């Protein structure tokens, strides 16, 4: 099993494209097996597997800092940062929490559990980095409806004029727990429909650079996009379109019902 050999992000950097595909399959199988016994968030994590592999392939955590909004979609991140046994061995299913936790790993920046906090937290990390004269990448990962929260908009407003390295990965699956509504999400749908070319672009309007990845479940496309923005000297949004629940038929068909689950029969 390839996942058994991944003890930290450095092990990802030597994988081939085919091995990354296989690793994603193994990670989803581990997520599925654990959720069937333990319960927990489901759809968000299944949609983020390839993006998490790509992030840890390109960036250099924990030097580069990841801030996961809510952090309910960080199970894959935990698997790849030395905590895989908590997803492979039933005896260790309770060894990790359902959210990021600095007491578990140096790869986790904050104890998070509430929505829309990542952009403000990440902007603070970027400001502190600059005051210290350091140069690591600061990466905020936000999705599942969090972008329309008030604190996220405050963070976006601040980041838009920071004029320093700040990378926002917008995980767009057109969902919160349930279907999203409102003018902001209408604009995001226009961006998806035009491969990121719509002039109705909130991020550009607020002063941020912008990249669009049509298939956010394609590790190679994601790696190319993340390499393009690594060490960038200004704020940028990488807008990735993912499928919530990807890889498990029932979760793909009922994205709201499979946002979170109690233990269940896999078949």
Where are these regions (language model features)?
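Short, functional N-terminal and low-complexity linear motifs
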Residues: 15-23, 87-94, 250-252
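Glycine-rich ThDP/TPP pyrophosphate-binding loop and its adjacent helix/strand module
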Residues: 108-267
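Residue-level signal for pocket-adjacent positions within structured domains
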Residues: 1, 7-10, 37, 82-85, ...
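Short amphipathic alpha-helical segments, especially helix-boundary/capping motifs
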Residues: 7, 25-31, 97-102, 132-133, ...
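Short alpha-helical interface elements
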Residues: 37, 45-56, 60, 76, ...
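Cofactor-binding active-site loop characterized by glycine-rich and histidine/acidic residues
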Residues: 41-162
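N-terminal amphipathic, basic-rich helices that act as targeting or association modules
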Residues: 1-81, 204, 210-222, 236-239
């Amino acid at each position: 099993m390839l996942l058994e050999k991944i003890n930290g992000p450095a092990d990802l950097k030597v994988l081939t494209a085919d091995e990354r595909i296989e690793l994603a399959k193994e990670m989803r199988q581990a997520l599925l097996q654990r959720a069937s016994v333990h319960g927990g968030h489901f759809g968000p994590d299944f949609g983020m597997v390839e993006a998490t592999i790509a992030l840890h392939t390109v960036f250099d955590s924990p030097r580069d800092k990841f801030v996961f909004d809510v952090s309910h979609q960080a199970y894959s991140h935990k698997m790849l940062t030395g905590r895989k046994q908590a997803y492979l061995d039933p005896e260790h299913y309770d060894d990790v929490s359902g959210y990021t936790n600095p007491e578990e790993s140096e790869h986790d920046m904050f104890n998070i559990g509430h929505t829309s906090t990542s952009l403000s937290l990440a902007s603070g990390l970027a400001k502190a980095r600059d005051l210290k004269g350091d140069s690591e990448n600061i990466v905020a990962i936000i999705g599942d409806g969090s972008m329309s929260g008030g604190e996220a908009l405050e963070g976006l407003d601040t980041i838009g004029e920071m004029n320093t390295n700040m990378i926002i990965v917008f995980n767009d699956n057109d969902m919160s727990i349930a279907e999203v509504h409102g003018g902001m999400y209408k604009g995001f749908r226009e961006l998806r429909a035009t491969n990121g070319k719509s002039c109705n672009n909130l991020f550009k309007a607020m002063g941020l650079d912008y990249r669009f990845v049509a298939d956010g479940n394609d590790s190679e496309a994601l790696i190319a996009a993340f390499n393009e923005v690594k060490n960038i000297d200004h704020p940028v949004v990488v807008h990735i379109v993912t499928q919530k629940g990807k890889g498990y038929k029932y979760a793909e068909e009922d994205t709201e019902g499979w946002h979170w689950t109690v233990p269940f029969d896999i078949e």
